[in-house]
Each structure stands twice: as C-alpha cells, then as structure tokens.
Amino acid sequence: MSWQTYVDTNLVGTGAVTQAAILGLDGNTWATSAGFAVTPAQGQTLASAFNNADPIRASGFDLAGVHYVTLRADDRSIYGKKGSAGVITVKTSKSILVGVYNEKIQPGTAANVVEKLADYLIGQGF
C-alpha cells in the first residue's frame, strides 16, 4: 500500500480526521491530503520535538498555517489544540503520522485512529 493510500483511506477516509499527512523522520512530506501543506521547516520542528519537546511545550507549534498549543508531547505522540479543533501526531520507527480534526470530531476519536495506524505501521517495521 502506498503512503498516499494510508492518508486517504486509513486516516481521512475514516472520517475521524479532516486532514492528514505522513512525514519522514527528517520532516519531509511523504504523503498529504489535498490542501494540507506542511512546510519542511514545520516538519523538521515536529520531528525534532519527539527528541526534545521543551521548545513546543513552551510556545506551541505550527502546521499547515495553523498554530497549535501543545497538550501532550513525549517520544511517541504530540497532541496540539487550536480552539476546539486539534492535531494528533505519532512517531513510528520510520515516519510521523499527522491527523487534524475539527470541532465536530471528538479528540479521542481522532487520537484512536492515528494511534492505531501507528501501531500497525510499527508492527510492519515502519
């Protein structure tokens, strides 16, 4: 399955996230949903935050033109919030999954979808 298929089917296609991307551990975009553009600098900031989250804990982070307040940040997951919408990011051994949800979607529902796909990819060696 292609990275784009994971974005279109396993993330956005579930209805639990409205936009999604898969990034490499270097922050470069491998696949993205239409209209969701994560810049290389934003991807690199996110990727480095999995090793040292202090900068994003203090000031939040930006993805695709939206500034998020950091709710959770550890070596596996970074959760951000903007009003009643937010973003779930999860690191696997070779990639970073990004799922954005809007105010109509429960954060836990979005987190469940992104975390489960991450678990699957980790199990597959990715």
Curated annotation (Swiss-Prot):
Listed name of the protein: Profilin-1A
Protein's job: Binds to actin and affects the structure of the cytoskeleton. At high concentrations, profilin prevents the polymerization of actin, whereas it enhances it at low concentrations. By binding to PIP2, it inhibits the formation of IP3 and DG.
GO cellular component, one term: actin cytoskeleton
Source species: Acanthamoeba castellanii (Amoeba)
SUPFAM superfamilies, sorted: Profilin (actin-binding protein)
Family stated for the protein in its record: Belongs to the profilin family.
InterPro entries on file: PFN, PFN_euk, PFN_sf, Profilin_CS
Covalent S-S links between cysteines: none
Region listing for Actin binding, in residue ranges: 2-36
